[in-house]
Amino acid sequence: MLIPSKLSRPVRLDHTVVRERLLAKLSGANNFRLALITSPAGYGKTTLISQWAAGKNDIGWYSLDEGDNQQERFASYLIATVQQATNGHCAICETMAQKRQYASLTSLFAQLFIELAEWHSPLYLVIDDYHLITNPVIHESMRFFIRHQPENLTLVVLSRNLPQLGIANLRVRDQLLEIGSQQLAFTHQEAKQFFDCRLSSPIEAAESSRICDDVSGWATALQLIALSARQNTHSAHKSARRLAGINASHLSDYLVDEVLDNVDLATRHFLLKSAILRSMNDALITRVTGEENGQMRLEEIERQGLFLQRMDDTGEWFCYHPLFGNFLRQRCQWELAAELPEIHRAAAESWMAQGFPSEAIHHALAAGDALMLRDILLNHAWSLFNHSELSLLEESLKALPWDSLLENPQLVLLQAWLMQSQHRYGEVNTLLARAEHEIKDIREGTMHAEFNALRAQVAINDGNPDEAERLAKLALEELPPGWFYSRIVATSVLGEVLHCKGELTRSLALMQQTEQMARQHDVWHYALWSLIQQSEILFAQGFLQTAWETQEKAFQLINEQHLEQLPMHEFLVRIRAQLLWAWARLDEAEASARSGIEVLSSYQPQQQLQCLAMLIQCSLARGDLDNARSQLNRLENLLGNGKYHSDWISNANKVRVIYWQMTGDKAAAANWLRHTAKPEFANNHFLQGQWRNIARAQILLGEFEPAEIVLEELNENARSLRLMSDLNRNLLLLNQLYWQAGRKSDAQRVLLDALKLANRTGFISHFVIEGEAMAQQLRQLIQLNTLPELEQHRAQRILREINQHHRHKFAHFDENFVERLLNHPEVPELIRTSPLTQREWQVLGLIYSGYSNEQIAGELEVAATTIKTHIRNLYQKLGVAHRQAAVQHAQKLLKMMGYGV
């Protein structure tokens, strides 16, 4: 829940000097990316910008405090500021920020700019007190923000120092509007106006000018002088002389003498107690100070000029000037040290009563009250966890003694989930084991079941499916029906375990159950995970169209719940890329893989391994070996600098081995084969994939017998487990083995099986990557004219893809080939006496390659009627009557010239 006062622009106070000369400079702020107002405390930065902002509608204001160094908190408030300025225009980003569904601040800002592209009027965002930000991630993100923000947006930053926002670059490019302390300092005229507003008896212009010079135009000093003069403690000029030459860091003594010592004791205590609040309203003041009518007391303090300012138009929220607030907090620690814990406890209770647990935790920590902190966490920690307030929770749990955690195992579980979310799997098990050892009766019942559900998730993440299955089953046996989150976790883990074991039908049912439960209870990341798993299972079963439809449901869920920034989004676009690749939609597959890389742009490069492998697959299917080699260099570098799941390694190895096959690199294949892992089983798609990689390398090396043993066993497992996509891939590799071993009838038999199975899977590219050997076999099958209609159509499609991407279009019918053919002693006399033109040779090559008339016309960029004329002429010259005879004639010519076809 966001504190309204942090998003409210300060109210323009009466009796303030209107800074006309500075407002004139700010009037052109819309021409700059950044308006930067910098000065030490007390120079009137906030007052100036609140004057400038008055009357503007498309403006948002964000007042920072120390707690805003948490990235999630900063993001929530900044997006809320944009929503304030745009009247709710950026709904997607607002949801993403509220639910913490973004990978990083920069990716959230990128989505923000997409939404703001439709906002065309000038827009202003004010960030006050930016000097409080010390988090380098936020600095880097704000540099990204400034580099990429829309032209119609101006960021206004108020800071006591020069922020780390790439200022020099903006200055060089004339995209920076700067106002510093020298410009903020009051002029003689402004000082005279100031005193005339504040003092009942005006002072002479000359004296006003001398006072202004004595304090170098420092607004806070002028305010203190006016306060002293009203309290009749000193003359204005005497106060000015005392303040001359000092700065904000040396004000404490002066403020004690001139402010605190000149108010009654009740007001002094009111100031000191209320200063612990970063923002305050009537209820907070009443609870913290013990005084009734808190609102009236605040308004009285404001009238006395004691550095209190309103934070919103309603007048409900107030805060002290930062300079004065810091001073009061220091004095409170000295003067009210014994009472301070109780004051913080009162503040925490009041914040809790108003529904702000994050602020309550801040005061409970300051009070050192472990019991209060424990109670807040017991009531609100899971809500904070689900909103990704992870840093705050971690700090809070560290502040609790271990005994307190043991007395409340729910907090131990929370700490373990925090570790799990940060991939600290070993620490999770250590923590839970320690807790179980020390907590009586924890080894049974609901809490033990929740521990087991979390342990099961850790085990499957850590690649231990047997342990994950055991723990998930135990959890489901012991969990009551109402413990929905842990039941979702355990059900999901059990479904994933069954997927790993190849029990696809049971796994699919559990993942569908997980999806249903997760949707019912709004646990959207598990709903998305279950859909991704369902798609993978359906793909493995060979139901690619149903897998596609399941992916569509997942994309819809991402859009509805704004999950675009979750790393799981990359998983989804990657399996979409795999499906598109299988169907030879290579451009779309490549685009999906690149979008996956974009989702992971803020993560370690190792996370991009799978998408990079997919890009290499696209290059290989196109026959673009140069590009594949370049990408492989990067992939192999990543492989050597990370620890990966076996599925990831299998996919990476797949593109390496295919590349070696295409380039004939037997040395690389042999070296890899000596060192690669040989899995114990082959009962899921990634283990099947690794064994297929091994068989492909063996075929390349001519080790046909061991490769055949591997592939036959893979096929047996695939058939028994209904891994139909793997069976389709295995048959294609077995076809290559038989073809290269000279077992042409066996090769044809398994190719026919593969073509038939492809009616279910829709595979195209899996055939294409086998290149010319596949093309030769498909040409023969097409010429036999015995294929069923669906298989005939698919064979022609595959042949076209091979011809398109693997550069076999006219390789045998170019000018050099024709010249050698005509000089060959066995060339048919008909061709000598009536030679074909070069264009007719090209057409014959395309006919031989399986092109239709329309495709030949498109390839040669001529009209279809022209192609018909060429075909008629070459038929006459060759003495053939139809297309199949022309193909057979071309094949004879190629054999005569020594080409294996």
Curated annotation (Swiss-Prot):
Binding site for ATP: S39, P40, A41, G42, Y43, G44, K45, T46
PROSITE patterns (alphabetical): HTH_LUXR_1, HTH_LUXR_2
UniProt activity-regulation remark: Activated by ATP and maltotriose, which are both required for DNA binding.
GO annotation (BP), single: positive regulation of DNA-templated transcription
Residue range(s) of DNA binding per entry: 853-872
Keywords, comma-separated and alphabetical: Activator, ATP-binding, Carbohydrate metabolism, DNA-binding, Nucleotide-binding, Transcription, Transcription regulation
Entries under InterPro entries matching the protein: P-loop_NTPase, Sig_transdc_resp-reg_C-effctor, TPR-like_helical_dom_sf, TPR_MalT, Tscrpt_reg_HTH_MalT, Tscrpt_reg_LuxR_C, WH-like_DNA-bd_sf
SMART domains assigned: HTH_LUXR (SM00421)
MF terms in GO: ATP binding; DNA binding; DNA-binding transcription factor activity
Purpose of the protein: Positively regulates the transcription of the maltose regulon whose gene products are responsible for uptake and catabolism of malto-oligosaccharides. Specifically binds to the promoter region of its target genes, recognizing a short DNA motif called the MalT box.
Subunit structure: Monomer in solution. Oligomerizes to an active state in the presence of the positive effectors ATP and maltotriose.
PANTHER family reported for this sequence: DNA-BINDING TRANSCRIPTIONAL ACTIVATOR DEVR_DOSR (PTHR44688:SF16)
Family from the record: Belongs to the MalT family.
Protein name (record): HTH-type transcriptional regulator MalT
Lineage per the UniProt record: Bacteria, Pseudomonadati, Pseudomonadota, Gammaproteobacteria, Enterobacterales
Record gene name: malT
